[in-house]
Amino acid sequence: FQLSTRPMLLVRDDLYVKHVNRVMVTIDGTGVGDDALRTACELVREIPGGTLTGVHVVRQESAPSRGGRTKADEVLDAAVQRARGFGVDMKAIHTEGKDIGRSVCLAASECNADLVVIASQDRRPLVARGLVDLDKLLGGSVSDYIRVHAPAPVLLVREPEQG
C-alpha cells in the first residue's frame, strides 16, 4: 500500500464495524491533510445522521499570539471553516501528546469513532518515491502506528501523484 496514491481502507482482522456514523479525521494543516478532510466530509455528507470530529495533535503547546490564539487554534479554525464549505459541521478537538499516533488513537477511542481518516505524506525526495520507504516498511511512522492501533478502521489518504 506504500506506493498507492488512492485512499485505502485498512481494517484490522479483530475489528468489526456494522455501521459508520462517527467519523474522525486528523487535522494537520497540510495539503494532503486537506485532502483527508475533504474525503471525510464527502463521506459524512452521505451518512444520514453522520458526525465528523477533527482532531489536531501537537507535541508541545505553543505560546499564544497577541490575540491569545495558538497556531493549533488557527489550524483547527481553518479546518472547521473548510468542512463548513463542504456542508459539514465538524467538532474540533485539540490535544497535546509526545506520541502523536498514540494521541490520535486515544482521541478516536474517546469520541467512539467508527472510522478514522488520516493523511499520509510521502516525505522522500522525488527521485526516491518509486522505492520502498524503509521507515514505513519497518513501522516507524505515525500513520503506521495509527493503522495498527486505532480502535476503528482507518481510511488512509495519500498525497496525489505528482506529474
Where are these regions (language model features)?
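Gly/Ser-rich helix-loop-strand patches that form or flank binding pockets
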Residues: 1-16, 110-163
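Charged docking surfaces used in two-component/phosphorelay signaling
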Residues: 95-103
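Small/aliphatic-rich secondary-structure junction motif
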Residues: 18-69, 80-93, 113, 149, ...
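Structural motif
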Residues: 11, 94-95
